Amino acid sequence: SRFKIGENIRIKEGVLKGNNAIFMGINENQRVSVLLSMMGRKLNISMPSLSLQAY
């Protein structure tokens, strides 16, 4: 992966575009897991790695 676990990233595509998150890992389907803070909650979501950029 081009990101390190715990690295701050920015979502650059989709409905969450512009949000910052923390890179948590990558699965066997090449989807990444990120931790996103929204509305006072932490959400662990999965998305294509091409949707992310370093922050």
Outline where the language-model segments fall.
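Ferredoxin-like alpha/beta domains used as RNA- or RNAP-binding modules
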Residues: 1-55
